[in-house]
């Protein structure tokens, strides 16, 4: 097995700095996008309720048209 290579402290500092900055950016971005996604999900749920209600009404009307006395 190959022995580990000595890495410059400056390179280590750069790597860990980039890691920390990436994590900080990700947390900030997540906090920015989370409320927007919640709003989109809420609107999608409202639209789904409206579509389901409309389909239910259409289905009831279709059944009422089929169930006439003059069959």
UniProtKB/Swiss-Prot annotation:
Location within or outside the cell: Mitochondrion; Mitochondrion inner membrane
Leader peptide range in chain numbering: none
Pfam families per the UniProt record, alphabetical: ATP-synt_E
Alphabetical GO biological process terms: proton motive force-driven ATP synthesis
CC terms in the record's Gene Ontology section: mitochondrial inner membrane; mitochondrion; proton-transporting ATP synthase complex
Keyword annotations of the record: Acetylation, ATP synthesis, CF(0), Hydrogen ion transport, Ion transport, Membrane, Mitochondrion, Mitochondrion inner membrane, Transport
InterPro entries membership: ATP_synth_F0_esu_mt (IPR008386)
GO function terms (MF aspect): proton transmembrane transporter activity
Residues found modified as N6-acetyllysine: 34
Functional description taken from the UniProt entry: Subunit e, of the mitochondrial membrane ATP synthase complex (F(1)F(0) ATP synthase or Complex V) that produces ATP from ADP in the presence of a proton gradient across the membrane which is generated by electron transport complexes of the respiratory chain. ATP synthase complex consist of a soluble F(1) head domain - the catalytic core - and a membrane F(1) domain - the membrane proton channel. These two domains are linked by a central stalk rotating inside the F(1) region and a stationary peripheral stalk.
Annotated family: Belongs to the ATPase e subunit family.
Record's subunit section: Component of the ATP synthase complex composed at least of ATP5F1A/subunit alpha, ATP5F1B/subunit beta, ATP5MC1/subunit c (homooctomer), MT-ATP6/subunit a, MT-ATP8/subunit 8, ATP5ME/subunit e, ATP5MF/subunit f, ATP5MG/subunit g, ATP5MK/subunit k, ATP5MJ/subunit j, ATP5F1C/subunit gamma, ATP5F1D/subunit delta, ATP5F1E/subunit epsilon, ATP5PF/subunit F6, ATP5PB/subunit b, ATP5PD/subunit d, ATP5PO/subunit OSCP.
Protein name (Swiss-Prot/TrEMBL): ATP synthase F(0) complex subunit e, mitochondrial
Taxonomic source organism: Bos taurus (Bovine)
């Amino acid at each position: 097995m190959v022995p580990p290579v000595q890495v410059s402290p400056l390179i280590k500092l750069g790597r860990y700095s980039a890691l920390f900055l990436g994590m900080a950016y990700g947390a900030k971005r997540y906090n920015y996008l989370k409320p927007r996604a919640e709003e989109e999900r809420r609107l999608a749920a409202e639209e789904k309720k409206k579509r389901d209600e409309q389909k239910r009404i259409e289905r009831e009307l279709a059944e009422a048209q089929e169930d006439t006395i003059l069959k």
